[in-house]
Design a protein with these regions (language model features):
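Bacterial N-terminal signal peptides that target proteins for export
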Residues: 1-12
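Bacterial N-terminal signal peptides
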Residues: 10-20
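Sec/Tat signal peptide C-region and signal peptidase I cleavage site
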Residues: 21-25
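Sequence/structural signature of beta-propeller domains
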Residues: 26-394
């Protein structure tokens, strides 16, 4: 969890609603309007900033749901929790605590945290989350296939399924918190599931080590099995000091975003042009460089837009955590433009993390959903983005 407050890298900010965390930055006022999108803040931990208030939603990060239309599961990096919502933001009663290394669930988990007076021990720091389509990844200590799987900045991967005791605790299935050494363990920023010729695997972006760590199904020890790939997810042309930050499975290919590491190799260093995106197959072979520098600024969220998403229908959308902007690319990796608001200003979402199409309970698969950790990751936001009407007249 980053402790540094981040600026939006913009010379001006326009608040779209009273107390809103959504802003439009006036960096490029001279260009003509090319597109228009509207943001709906659904859930926030801060009163008045969204339709629903949930104090547990701090630094909202990864999002997952089942194809059968489960609620949206949203990882709360600041509170060590995964909270559940409908597509309209209605909260579901279940919330799941993510354990620290050693399967410890601190009392602070799934409770609001004061960043100026953090608890000791602090809760876990979940990031990426996936719905598990495989029966081969079991919750440790059970014969239950995991339903949702969570990665953390603590260097762990945890699993959850219905029927656990207690029912609201995930269980650690892989622990690299001390690998290669205590105090220098893995920092997982993202997680996806993918299929290769060898079967189903989990792929975790290890920001500290600069690797994609791969896990196969449950082994004889009851834990997920470390795996290797033929290609190793290597790109010798990525500059030193950059590491895998986000990861997404788009049409069977793995898109990996790279951000600049800070001195501790725990958090990113935001800045214009600080970012790269590569495309790999699920056996770790580099297929192509998709994007380099340019509009990228600590890119993390990435998805393909629906084919009912206005001017950017079907395009690859890449969200910048560093400045909160959303960039549209064609399939070749050619940058097209940024998303604008209805007034022609670049759309900015402070602390932007996930971009994902709908599909969870009460949502449309044409709607783009997002999460964010505004105000230096101390607060949280879950919402959606849809095409907007451009105002007419002066």
């Amino acid at each position: 969890m980053c402790q540094l407050t981040r600026s939006l890298q913009a010379t001006a900010m326009i608040v779209l609603a009273a107390g809103s965390m959504i802003a439009a930055a006036a960096e490029d006022d001279s260009r003509p309007q090319r597109n228009a999108y509207a943001v709906a803040p659904l859930v926030s931990n801060v009163a008045g900033r969204a339709t629903v208030q949930d104090p547990v939603l701090q630094n909202a990060w990864g999002v997952a749901f089942s194809p059968a239309g489960s609620p949206f599961w949203v990882n709360d990096n600041g509170t060590g929790c995964s909270t559940l919502y409908s597509g309209a933001g209605t909260k579901v009663a279940l919330q799941v605590s993510i354990p620290l290394p050693g399967n410890v669930v601190p009392a602070a988990s799934c409770h609001a945290v004061d960043p100026n007076n953090p608890p000791n021990p602090a809760p876990a720091a979940p990031t990426g989350i996936v719905w598990n389509p495989s029966a081969a990844f079991l919750v440790p200590g059970t014969k239950l296939p995991a339903v949702f799987i969570f990665a953390t900045e603590d260097g762990t991967v945890s699993a959850w399924a219905g029927g656990l005791n207690p029912p609201d605790h995930a269980v650690i299935a892989a622990d690299n918190s001390s690998s290669p050494a205590a105090g220098n363990g893995a920092v997982y920023k993202g997680l996806v599931f993918g299929l290769s010729a060898k079967g189903g695997f989990l792929y975790a972006a290890n920001f500290r080590a600069g690797t994609i760590d791969v896990f196969g199904p449950t082994g004889s020890d009851g834990l997920f099995t470390p795996a290797t790939t033929d290609g190793g997810f290597a790109d010798p042309d990525i500059p030193a000091g950059y590491a895998p930050f986000g990861i997404a499975n788009i049409d069977g290919d793995l898109f990996v975003t790279y951000a600049k590491q800070n001195a501790a190799k725990h958090d990113d260093v935001a800045g214009p042009g600080h970012g790269f995106v590569d495309v790999f197959d699920t056996d770790g072979h580099l297929l192509r460089r998709f994007a380099s520098r340019g509009p990228l600024n600590s890119p993390w969220g990435i998805t393909r837009a629906s084919f009912a998403f206005g001017p950017f229908s079907g395009k690859i959308l890449i969200g910048n955590f560093g400045n909160g902007r959303i960039n549209a690319f064609d399939d070749s990796g050619r940058f097209i433009d940024e998303l604008d608001d209805a007034h022609g200003k670049p759309l900015v979402i402070d602390g932007l993390w996930t971009l994902t199409l709908g599909g969870g309970r009460g949502s449309s698969s044409d709607t783009l959903y997002f999460t964010a950790g505004p105000d230096g990751e101390s607060n949280g936001l879950f919402g959606n983005i849809v095409p907007a009407t451009v105002p007419s007249g002066p």
